[in-house]
Amino acid sequence: MTEVFTADTTIDRSVDVVWARLIDRDSATRWMPGVDALRAQDPTEIGTTLIFTTRGKERTGQIAALNPGRSITLRSVQGGVTAGYVYTCSGYGDRTPVRLLADCSMTGPVRLLSPLIRSAIRRADSGQLDAFAATFTRE
């Protein structure tokens, strides 16, 4: 997979509070651009399928890796594009650094469009952590 972007922020809350919001599916629409709904029928664990609605269409992703309280990796495959989003929390008292690493790979004819697709992903999602941090200031 090729890195698309990395984003970092620090939130003035404990890692437990930040982590709880990060994995709260109901709050995802507040900070994931273009996501109108996010649901899953299973608990937050490796292999859980996530169903999200974006631009009027249902799509699926999966929890590919999980270190509770520390990191979660969401992976989705749409056509020949596989995207991975790794969210990492590092707790230090009442301040929690959070990092998002987005990467993707492409197969088949869509590979010809890889620079455009990576640019679109970067443009759409590189502000996720700023939006996520803002959910704490709106409390």
Regions found by a protein language model. Name each.
Residues D8-D12, R39, I51, Q62, ...:
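Generic structural detector for well-ordered beta-strands
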Residues T48-R55, I72-Q78:
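Short beta-strand segments that buttress and anchor functional surface loops
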Residues M1-R39:
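Hydrophobic ligand-binding cavity/cleft-lining segments
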Residues F5-A7, T48-L50, Y85, V98-L100:
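Hydrophobic residues positioned within well-ordered beta-strands of beta-sheet architectures
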Residues V77-G127, A134, R138:
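Beta-strand/loop substructures that line and gate deep hydrophobic ligand-binding cavities in soluble
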Residues V4-T6, K57-G61, V81-V86:
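Short, surface-exposed coil-to-beta transition loops
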Residues D12-D16, A65-G69, T88-P97:
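A short, structured loop/turn motif at beta-sheet edges
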Residues L38-I46:
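A solvent-exposed, acidic/Ser-Thr-rich amphipathic alpha-helical stretch
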